[in-house]
Amino acid sequence: MYIEKISLLNFKNYPELELSFSAGINLFAGLNGSGKTNLLDSIYCLCLTKSFLSTTDQQTITTGQGYFSALGWFQENAKEFKIQYDFDGKKKSFTVDKKPYAKISEHIGRFPAIVLTPHDTDLIRNSSEDRRRFFDTLFSQADHVYLDALIRYNHFIKQRNALLKQAADGMLVDRILMDAYDHNLLQSGKIIAQKRDEYLKRLLPIFQEYYSLLSPDHEATDIEYETNVLSADFEQVFKDSYSKDLILQRTNKGVHKDDFKFLINNEPIKHYGSQGQQKTFVIALKLAQYELLKACTGHNPILLMDDIFDKLDDLRIEKLIHLVQKYITGQLFISDARPDRSSIFFQSNTKDFRMFIIDRGKVEQSPPSQSELNTDV
């Protein structure tokens, strides 16, 4: 599975753009701020129906315009699929071969994708919400049962919190409605917690293996899932928190409060890990994500690497390149402000590759290399 070509209209700093890609390696070279990351984001959007950069679709529209459109032609098992993502300033639409999905969420996991960025260490430093979001994105691509449960849970948590706020404003609480919300939250929350526990157990040994291959040292690493939802008495704990929920006007127990502890030598890596160890940790986690998605979906995910070599020492860069060349069997996109640094990917590489020079929203393909001339796309 890979993306063959793309067409953008009013997408960030690209008023209009059409590009054809290699099924192997694609390098976006250009200065910082030229639009390399925006190109990666357009591919991510077509795979996951949302940006990894912008918090709203409105922020994706080219300045001064009222809409955007992104089209991608994907190859899967010798068949071509045309994916179109439109936003008219108010409403988004997603179609495959001009046919709309009954629910946009049906697209999640069909064309799996993973992005590595220099900001991935924020997963370690930031709040539990960011870690939950990361694992939710991973598990949702891997398992639609998980995704459906997550959508239901998020819906009912909003409804329940709205009911709690009404009570705070002096309105009587509809206990029948509240009980219905509670039932649905407990039901979908248990599915989410069970799936998180199940998939983390599958992910952990893959992650630990990648960390050991990337790190020059021999630190012990671990990821622990923290939840009380799977405890036998959780339903009673949930009900007992109702008085507190009324006071705070929000639901205080459930999987939306879970966390994932990142550990190195049995200590929180947030406090005890060096900058290099933290970067190695998240890179290993993303590579493990690739392997898990490949196993669950039956497809090679598209791997997007955004300036990932920035601030990595030479040894870790060399190890990362070796692992990517050895284990990443699908399509790869790399952005780099220093293409000479990324050129090591192409040395002794049998994969087809293309280099694109990006300058302030304008993109040109560099002349094909000898390996490209000798390789069919």
UniProtKB/Swiss-Prot annotation:
For this protein, the record's InterPro entries field holds: DNA-binding_RecF, DNA-binding_RecF_CS, P-loop_NTPase, RecF/RecN/SMC_N, RecF_2
Q: Where does ATP bind?
A: 30-37
The GO terms this record gives for MF are:
ATP binding; single-stranded DNA binding
> Which Pfam families does this entry report, sorted A to Z?
SMC_N
Q: Which GO terms describe its cellular component?
A: cytoplasm
**Alphabetical keyword list:** ATP-binding, Cytoplasm, DNA damage, DNA repair, DNA replication, DNA-binding, Nucleotide-binding, SOS response
**Where does this one sit in the cell?**
Cytoplasm
Source taxon at top rank: Bacteria
A Gene Ontology biological process noted in the UniProt record is:
DNA replication
Q: What is its main location?
A: cytoplasm
Residues spanning the membrane: none
User: What does the similarity note say?
Assistant: Belongs to the RecF family.
Q: Which HAMAP family match?
A: RecF
Function in brief: The RecF protein is involved in DNA metabolism; it is required for DNA replication and normal SOS inducibility. RecF binds preferentially to single-stranded, linear DNA. It also seems to bind ATP.
Name-wise, this protein is: DNA replication and repair protein RecF
> What organism is recorded for this protein?
Cytophaga hutchinsonii (strain ATCC 33406 / DSM 1761 / CIP 103989 / NBRC 15051 / NCIMB 9469 / D465)
